[in-house]
From Swiss-Prot:
The keyword Signal applies. It comes from the Eukaryota. Keywords: Disulfide bond, Protease inhibitor, Secreted, Serine protease inhibitor, Signal. It comes from Bungarus candidus. This is Kunitz-type serine protease inhibitor B.
Length: 83
């Protein structure tokens, strides 16, 4: 296989992995915990996964503490927990 064909194959496999939704049984347990703003007073834009609505939602993170259901972007949240 040529290097161009191999590169195309790797790109397609990566795209497929990014677009494949996370099923609820494969979803990490931390995706099911409620958002925790943390104990500090910063106003950081963050995202958490809401299992009832089955989507990522923006919230204000305090900047420290909190839990694992806390993502810097909606895309990062979707990759980890699905949508």
């Amino acid at each position: 296989m040529s290097s161009g064909g191999l590169l195309l194959l790797v790109g397609l496999l990566t795209l497929c992995a990014e677009l494949t939704p996370v099923s609820s049984k494969d979803r990490p347990k931390f995706c099911n915990v409620p958002p925790e703003p943390g104990r500090c007073n910063a106003n950081v834009r963050a995202f958490y996964y809401n299992p009832r609505l089955r989507k990522c939602i923006e919230f204000t993170y305090g900047g420290c503490g909190g839990n694992a259901n806390n993502f810097k972007s909606g895309g990062e949240c979707k990759r980890a927990c699905g949508e």
